[in-house]
Amino acid sequence: MQQPGADTWYMPDALQVDALLSSLATEFRLDTAPQYAATVVYADSFDWRLYQQGYLLHCHGQAWTLYHGNSGEVTVQQGGPELSGACFSRDFPPGKLRETLEPLLGIRCLLPLAVVSLSGRQIRLLNRDEKTVARIVVETQQPAGKGPVFRLIRLFGIRGYDQEQALVRRLLEENGVCETVSPLIGFAEGCRAMGRQPLDYSSKFTLELDAGSTARQAMGRIYQTLLENINRNIPGAVEDWDSEFLHDLRVAIRRTRSGLSLVKKVLPDAMVDRFSRDFGLLGKLTGPTRDLDVYLLNRSDYQNRLAPALQAGLNGFFSELERRRQVEQKKMMRVLRAKKSKAILSAWHRALRSPDRQPAPFAGIPVGELSGRIIMKRFRRVLRDGRNLDVATPDTEVHRLRIQCKKLRYAMEFFSSLYPKQEVQILLRQLKKLQDILGDFNDLSVQQEMLRLTLKDLHAGPRRNLEQAAALGGLMQSLFQEQQALRSHFSEAFEQFSDPATTGLFHELFRKQQGAS
């Protein structure tokens, strides 16, 4: 979202509203609306999905307003839920607001980001023909607490009345209204008061490394960035605001573990061994809840795979998954709040900040040389393992290749800032196509095994169990057929990934950098 300000100004402290209106009244007839006052709560997803698309959303009680942040134009006003904590697009009644929010938010919840008190009035400026030529809004914005008070003047032009608007600007300037400001100043300051700022979080790994840094310095920054993501997602995972907090938490843990296994002899061996175990433990303890999340998020897809007569048979299955998830969520909450988990993260932070007593052999080499070695090693491993796959390859071997692709992607993301952005993005897109197929294949394999075990434990007898068995059997067949189809898609994707153009670009980027270091 752009930060507008050309048509918004600070109102000088010495300027009274009545004096300003008197000045405008010398050239226009004024139609002043009643004064408004409200304390609004701005809301967005944790990763700013609305803001990224140019929207701001706030509520006053159950009255919600969505508007374009750049222009200030209202998109839709509608009733909705009371924002006492997290809420989802599905919590809004059917209507335009819900229809707008659903594709933008997806499975992410809305969270309160800033509380701002607004008061002001709107004035229409009319010419001699009683035509509205412009609108002025005089507004006071004050973030919650003892935040500063911002007195603003906003000008909204009307198409076709450029001369009149130029006259308004001149009158404002004559009254000392000169300093432009973003109309979002209250929102921005309100976010800052709550420890946030727009676009301060993204699930994507982004980090600009210094090409002149050592391997130890670069890896320290990478691990610190991942640790920040872990710490930022723990509250949402513990409070269970939405499933993406746990997902992003686990991705940051997994990236940390991959870094420790990928980048050898940069940190001391004892440090690597200790924290590989620690982060492995955190990954294991957060896994069951995430696994259940995946099944529950697929509920609609599972039901749509079945004939209508079989769909009701899944109700008991999902009820049991929801019950198990509640149990696992409570276990995970206790783990993440426990002293041991906090001690692991605190110790990791201290270790990254402290100088190593005995530097590792590769700690001082240039990061560019190290990155080229690691990426090319992983690339060659993916090519080797991928060429061994065929239609009869066991699922476990496909899973192993998926892990190798993931390690290659993590390595490329860690060091991407050291290489030409456009070329790296081309390679990452090719790799992602391959990863998506392998990931879907593995998910289908795991899901079939879970369904098989559920069927095995299902006791014969009640009609409800028979209906569930029929539904699970039909679902397993559907998942199996999709998995088989993916094998041929994999062959196509791997051929493209391993073609001369892609392999040539890998060698050009990463071997050249490696050799130049």
Could you tell me what each predicted segment is?
Residues 1-517:
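Function-determining surface determinants
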